[in-house]
C-alpha cells in the first residue's frame, strides 16, 4: 500500500465525522469526506483539520458534494443513509437506504473500481449485498462492518461481568447484524479461558451469560433508545477503522465481519458475519468455525432473516 492512501468516506453524519477524526489521529491516509448535503462535509473537514493541529496530525481532509473527488480511492467507507430512531429496527430502513446504496455503488464503480469497500449503512447485511451486486467489485473487496462492533459490545459486557479489563476478553458474534445475531459464548474467552469454563468455576451463571447475550443482540437498540434522536457512532466508527487499518497495513487480523459466503457455513451468495482474515487483498480467508447443532441452527435462522430481506429488494 502506498505511503499516503486515499480514503473516501461516503456520508458525513455522526459516524462519517467520527471516522474522519479517528483516521486522521491514526495518520492512516488523506481523506475525502463526501455528503449530498452542501456545507456539512466542508464544515466538518475544516473543524477536524483544525483539531488535528493540536494532535500533531497533518492529514488532509477534503469536504465535497462531488463524487468525482473519490476518484482513485484506495479504500471507501460507506455510512450514507437514514439512521435508526427509537422503536425502529435496522430492517425498517431497507427501502430508502437501498436506493441510496445503489446510487453510491454506481459512483464507486465509476470512480474507484479498485477500492476496498467497507459498508456500515443498515440494514447492514442487505446493504453490503446491494453494494457488491451494483458495483461489480470483487467480493473480497466488499465487506460489512458488523461483527467487530457486536463483538466489542459482547466484550464490554463480559468484562463488566467478570470484573476484568476488556483487553483480557475475546469474543465472537456470528450471523446477521440484527436481533437474531449469534454471540458465541463457547468461542469467547477471558485470557484464554472459555466462558463456559468460567461458569463451571462459579464466576458467573448460565442465566447471567444469557442475559449478556440478549443485551448484546439489543446493543444498538439500547443506545438508540437512550439517545432518542440518533444511533451509536463512536463504537461503529472505531470498529470500521480497525478493519480499514488491517487492510491498509496488511496486518492480517482475524476480525468478524459481514463477508460474502460461497458455501462456508452452508451458505451461498449471501453476506453474514463470520471471522475473516483482512490483509492487503481484502478478505484473505473466511475462517469456518465448527459449530454445534444448536449454534448452527441459530446461525441458519439469522441468515434466513437476511435472505428474506434481500428477496424483498431484488
Swiss-Prot record:
Positions with a binding annotation for NAD(+): 11-16, 35, 97, 120-122
Swiss-Prot/TrEMBL GO biological process terms: lactate metabolic process; tricarboxylic acid cycle
GO molecular function: L-lactate dehydrogenase activity; L-malate dehydrogenase (NAD+) activity
Record bears the keyword Oxidoreductase: yes
Family: Belongs to the LDH/MDH superfamily. MDH type 3 family.
Domain of life according to the entry: Bacteria
Gene3D superfamilies according to UniProt: Lactate dehydrogenase/glycoside hydrolase, family 4, C-terminal, NAD(P)-binding Rossmann-like Domain
Enzyme class name: oxidoreductase
Disulphide bonds in the chain: none
Catalytic activity reported: (S)-malate + NAD(+) = oxaloacetate + NADH + H(+)
Role played: Catalyzes the reversible oxidation of malate to oxaloacetate.
Family matches, as SUPFAM superfamilies: LDH C-terminal domain-like, NAD(P)-binding Rossmann-fold domains
Protein name: Malate dehydrogenase
Signal peptide positions on this chain: none
Active site: 177
Residues the entry annotates as binding substrate: 84, 90, 122, 153
